[in-house]
Structures are given as structure tokens and as C-alpha cells.
């Protein structure tokens, strides 16, 4: 029996919801909603206040000329993955826990994601991730599991 702490506090539901964001492989969005509706829903459940210019700038970081009125079920696997990463960026909790964030992404998006990770780490954020790809970040620690 034991406990896990974060910033010298035992992690409970409140601390977990305020400080941690998990993005996994499972479906995280509603198929029948548009991208825009999914973004607004995701931000509302995480109590994130945003304005449209920040949202649009973030959308353009991962998507070039994507119609936000497109339904989620119409997206490719890679586009769905980009939406996950966009939501990660918009919610921006101190600790990100990610399951294989690079799968299904094109080269340009992987570069953008690495840049996003670098900025997160520069700002004293924490990223815990599992990946099948080689990671090309600076100043990170790895634990190789086989």
C-alpha cells in the first residue's frame, strides 16, 4: 500500500483532474458531432475558457485548410489523431500522459508535435508517453521496456 504524489500532494481525483490529461488510443470524440462541436465539448468538460482566435491559431498548427464543420466519423485515422493533439494543446494541463502519440501522423505533424513537446518541457511541463517510434526530443529521460 502506498501513494503517488505530485508537487508534494497525494494525487486524488481533484488533483488528477486539475493537473493531468491522458490521451490514449481509444475513441475520445463523438462521431456524430463536427470537429468544432467536439472541440467545444472537450473544452467545456475540462472547464477551459478560450476565444476563437486562440482556437483557430491552435487548429492551424495541426490542420491546414480543414473544415471544422466536418463530422468526426469522416476523418482519417491521422486526422483523428491530430484532433487529439489539438485538444491536448488547448486544454494544456501541467502533466500530459500519452499513449503512442506519433502513430498515424505525417512527417510535418510529427515535427510540429516535437516542437510542441519541446515548448511544454521548456515551460517545466511533464510528458509521460509510450511510443513505438524513436523520440527526437532534447533533454528528456527514457525508460526502455522490452
What are these regions (language model features)?
Residues 2-18:
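Conserved ABC transporter NBD signature motif
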Residues 26, 31-49, 54-57:
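Q-loop/switch helix immediately C-terminal to the Walker
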Residues 52-70, 89:
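Conserved ABC ATPase "signature" region
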Residues 71-80:
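Conserved ABC ATPase signature
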Residues 85, 124:
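Hydrophobic anchor residue at the start of the ABC signature
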Residues 90-95:
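A short, proline-enriched helix->beta-strand linker immediately N-terminal to the Walker B motif
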Residues 96-100, 105:
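Catalytic Walker B motif of ABC-type/P-loop ATPase nucleotide-binding domains
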Residues 107-109:
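Helix N-cap at the start of a conserved alpha-helix in ABC-type nucleotide-binding domains
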Amino acid at each position: 500500500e502506498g501513494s503517488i504524489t505530485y508537487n508534494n500532494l497525494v494525487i486524488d481525483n481533484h488533483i488528477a483532474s486539475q493537473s493531468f490529461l491522458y490521451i490514449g488510443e481509444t475513441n475520445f470524440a463523438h462521431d456524430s458531432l463536427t470537429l468544432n462541436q467536439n472541440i467545444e465539448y472537450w473544452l467545456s468538460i475540462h472547464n477551459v475558457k478560450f476565444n476563437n482566435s486562440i482556437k483557430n491559431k491552435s487548429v492551424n498548427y495541426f490542420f491546414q485548410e480543414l473544415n471544422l464543420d466536418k463530422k468526426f466519423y469522416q476523418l482519417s485515422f491521422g486526422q483523428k489523431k491530430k484532433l487529439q493533439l489539438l485538444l491536448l494543446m488547448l486544454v494544456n494541463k501541467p502533466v500530459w500522459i500519452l499513449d503512442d502519440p506519433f502513430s498515424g501522423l505525417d512527417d510535418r505533424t510529427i515535427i510540429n508535435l516535437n516542437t510542441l513537446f519541446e515548448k511544454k518541457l521548456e515551460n517545466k511541463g511533464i510528458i509521460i508517453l509510450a511510443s513505438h517510434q524513436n523520440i527526437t526530443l532534447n533533454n528528456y529521460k527514457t525508460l526502455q521496456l522490452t
